[in-house]
C-alpha cells in the first residue's frame, strides 16, 4: 500500500500532499471567483482559524482550501516532503524539474 504524505497548512490542519493541484495567492480576481464558486458548491474548506487568507490550495477533488500560511511556505513544505529542499529565496516556478 502506498503511504500518503500529509502537508501541514497551519494550525494543526493537514492535507494529502499528493492531491494538491495548485497553491496560489488569493489576491487575483480569478482566484476570488474560484473561491466564491467553491463556496456556493460546498467545496470550500476554510482552514485559516479566523486569520487572513494568505494562500488558496486547489485539490484534485476540486475542493478549494483556504490557508493562513503564505504560498511560499507551503511550497517549501511540499518540496521538503518530495525531497526537493528550497531555500528562502528560491522561486518554485524557476526550479529545474
UniProtKB/Swiss-Prot annotation:
Disulfide bonds: none annotated. InterPro entries: RemA-like (IPR007169). Pfam families: RemA-like (PF04025). Coiled coil: none annotated. Belongs to the RemA family. NCBIfam families: PRK04323.1. This is Putative regulatory protein Dole_1911. It comes from Desulfosudis oleivorans (strain DSM 6200 / JCM 39069 / Hxd3) (Desulfococcus oleovorans). The lineage of its organism: Bacteria, Pseudomonadati, Thermodesulfobacteriota, Desulfobacteria, Desulfobacterales.
Amino acid at each position: 500500500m502506498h503511504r500518503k504524505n500529509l502537508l501541514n497548512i497551519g494550525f494543526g490542519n493537514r492535507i494529502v500532499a499528493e492531491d494538491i493541484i495548485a497553491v496560489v495567492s488569493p489576491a487575483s480576481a480569478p482566484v476570488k471567483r474560484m473561491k466564491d464558486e467553491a463556496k456556493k458548491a460546498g467545496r470550500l474548506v476554510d482552514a485559516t482559524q479566523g486569520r487572513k487568507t494568505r494562500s488558496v490550495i486547489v485539490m484534485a477533488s476540486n475542493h478549494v482550501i483556504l490557508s493562513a500560511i503564505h504560498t511560499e511556505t507551503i511550497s517549501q513544505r511540499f518540496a521538503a516532503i518530495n525531497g526537493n529542499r528550497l531555500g528562502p529565496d528560491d522561486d518554485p516556478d524557476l526550479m529545474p524539474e
